[in-house]
């Protein structure tokens, strides 16, 4: 079985192709193009325009890289949510067009579930406590009774979004990442003094908006590297407190980190210490799968297709607020 997957939930348009043969799964292609705004944040209309322009190019590149054509494809998987509406619509439209034109099954995929599943596949995690950390999501989850249950999450903005907004407003970005290192880490590593900022954890839930607002107000008053250092340390320590509490509650001895923030070296260092203290194993999704990508959609689509999870074209509406705990998982 060969599945083509389309990702377009935010700033990335990606296409992945995954093949299963003789119970062996291989990722044949994982091609993407990410939109970086010249200034400011992401504007939905600009994202949609980027995706429309890149879609035919990325689809062709993926097929060429995989050395297959659409006749070889058994199903088209697409991320229908959560995400930014105009961006989601482009991916959904491309997926519908391919499915109709080549008479292929259409497979609905939840973007967050795809992040988790590619993490499970690439790290060989078995039954972990999952930290899903990205620009739009900060979720602590486990799998139980056919669903990924949420044990903790952000009460307002996501960890990744908070950090991105801060470095942008501080004049450090774009670009947000330089040679694989986020601007917050580049700046924070020069900091020496801790600046007191809001630290808000409620049970296993976190709130990052107060931290962001307070840090921005200090930009003209304190040394920038010190503010960066304090923002990073407080933000990650909030997550660690919630994570440790969730580990105690669930009894898990394995931590899986997925999503774009999983690439943070400083967060990895903190989580390694936490895992060691609790006798747990830390597993982090490889960098090529941490950010948004088409391979994770194709892989999750493959799992879904094997359990006959398809959707008619007329019902393939986008779901910008589609939570991971609302998705039934028949393959686990």
Curated annotation (Swiss-Prot):
Keywords: Acyltransferase, Cytoplasm, Iron, Metal-binding, Transferase, tRNA processing. It is an enzyme of class 2 (transferase). Substrate binds at residues 132-136, 164, 185, 264. GO terms for cellular component: cytoplasm; EKC/KEOPS complex. It is found in: Cytoplasm. Its EC number is 2.3.1.234. It catalyses: L-threonylcarbamoyladenylate + adenosine(37) in tRNA = N(6)-L-threonylcarbamoyladenosine(37) in tRNA + AMP + H(+). SUPFAM superfamilies: Actin-like ATPase domain. GO terms for biological process: tRNA threonylcarbamoyladenosine modification. Fe cation binds at residues 111, 115, 132, 292. Binds 1 Fe(2+) ion per subunit. Its cofactor is Fe(2+). GO terms for molecular function: iron ion binding; N(6)-L-threonylcarbamoyladenine synthase activity. The keyword Thylakoid does not apply. It comes from the Archaea. Required for the formation of a threonylcarbamoyl group on adenosine at position 37 (t(6)A37) in tRNAs that read codons beginning with adenine. Is probably involved in the transfer of the threonylcarbamoyl moiety of threonylcarbamoyl-AMP (TC-AMP) to the N6 group of A37. Belongs to the KAE1 / TsaD family. HAMAP family: Kae1. NCBIfam families: arch_KAE1, gcp_kae1. This is tRNA N6-adenosine threonylcarbamoyltransferase. The lineage of its organism: Archaea, Thermoproteota, Thermoprotei, Sulfolobales, Sulfolobaceae. The gene is kae1.
């Amino acid at each position: 079985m060969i599945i083509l997957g389309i990702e377009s939930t935010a700033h990335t348009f990606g296409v992945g192709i995954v093949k299963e043969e003789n119970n062996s799964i291989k990722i044949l292609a994982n091609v993407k193009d990410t939109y970086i705004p010249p200034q400011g944040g992401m504007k939905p209309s600009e994202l949609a325009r980027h995706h429309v322009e890149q879609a035919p190019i990325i689809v062709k590149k993926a097929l060429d890289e995989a050395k297959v054509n659409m006749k070889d494809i058994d199903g088209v998987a697409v991320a229908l949510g959560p995400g930014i509406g105009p961006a989601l619509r482009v991916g959904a439209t491309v997926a519908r067009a391919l499915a109709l034109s080549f008479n292929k099954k259409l497979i609905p995929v939840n973007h967050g579930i795809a992040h988790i599943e590619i993490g499970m596949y690439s790290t060989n995690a078995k039954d972990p406590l999952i930290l899903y950390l990205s620009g739009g999501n900060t979720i602590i989850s486990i799998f139980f009774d056919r669903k990924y249950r949420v044990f903790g999450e952000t009460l307002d903005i996501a960890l990744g979004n908070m950090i991105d907004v801060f470095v942008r407003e501080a004049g450090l970005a774009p670009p947000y990442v330089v040679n694989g290192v986020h601007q917050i880490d580049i700046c924070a590593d020069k900091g020496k003094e801790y600046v007191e900022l809001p630290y808000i954890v409620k049970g296993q839930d976190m709130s990052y908006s107060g931290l962001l607002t307070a840090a921005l107000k200090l930009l003209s008053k304190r040394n920038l590297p010190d503010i960066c250092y304090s923002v990073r340390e407080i933000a990650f320590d909030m997550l660690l407190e919630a994570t440790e509490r969730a580990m105690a509650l669930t009894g898990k001895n394995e931590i899986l980190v997925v999503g774009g923030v999983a690439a943070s070296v400083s967060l990895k260092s903190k989580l390694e210490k936490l895992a060691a203290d609790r006798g747990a194993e830390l597993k982090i999704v490889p960098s090529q799968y941490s950010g948004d990508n088409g391979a994770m959609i194709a892989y999750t689509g493959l799992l879904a297709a094997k359990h006959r999870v398809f959707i008619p074209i007329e019902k393939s509406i986008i779901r910008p607020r589609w939570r991971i705990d609302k998705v039934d998982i028949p393959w686990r």
